[in-house]
Amino acid sequence: KKDGYPVNMEECRYNCWKNAYCDKLCKEKKGQSGYCYGWNLSCWCIGLPDNTNTKMNPFCQTAD
């Protein structure tokens, strides 16, 4: 298992405002839990399966 920022189909992080959104997202991705990381407003997941993609595309338009 690993911790990290999950990415979508375009390999961009999930932007967020609420911890509940990220916790649900992370659990859907088979993680243990998650929260909205305040410095960059992106979901951070704890306990994701090792094969979950957490490598972000450098061309993503993100809030950070």
Swiss-Prot record:
It comes from Centruroides elegans (Bark scorpion). This is Beta-toxin CeII8. Has the structural arrangement of an alpha-helix connected to antiparallel beta-sheets by disulfide bonds (CS-alpha/beta). One of its GO terms (molecular function) is sodium channel inhibitor activity. Belongs to the long (4 C-C) scorpion toxin superfamily. Sodium channel inhibitor family. Alpha subfamily. Expressed by the venom gland. InterPro entries: LCN-type_CS_alpha_beta_dom, Scorpion_toxin-like, Scorpion_toxin-like_sf, Scorpion_toxinL, Scorpion_toxinL/defensin. The keyword Disulfide bond applies. The protein sequence seems to be related to the alpha-toxins, however experimental data show that it has a clear beta-toxin activity. Its main location: secreted. The keyword Disulfide bond applies. GO terms for biological process: defense response. One of its GO terms (cellular component) is extracellular region. Disulfide bonds join C12-C60, C16-C36, C22-C43, C26-C45. Keywords: Disulfide bond, Ion channel impairing toxin, Neurotoxin, Secreted, Toxin, Voltage-gated sodium channel impairing toxin. SMART domains: Knot1. Pfam families: Toxin_3. It is found in: Secreted. Residues 2-61 form the LCN-type CS-alpha/beta domain. Beta toxins bind at site-4 of sodium channels and shift the voltage of activation toward more negative potentials thereby affecting sodium channel activation and promoting spontaneous and repetitive firing. Has a selective effect toward Nav1.7/SCN9A which plays a role in pain mechanisms, and especially in the development of inflammatory pain. Shows no lethality toward mice.
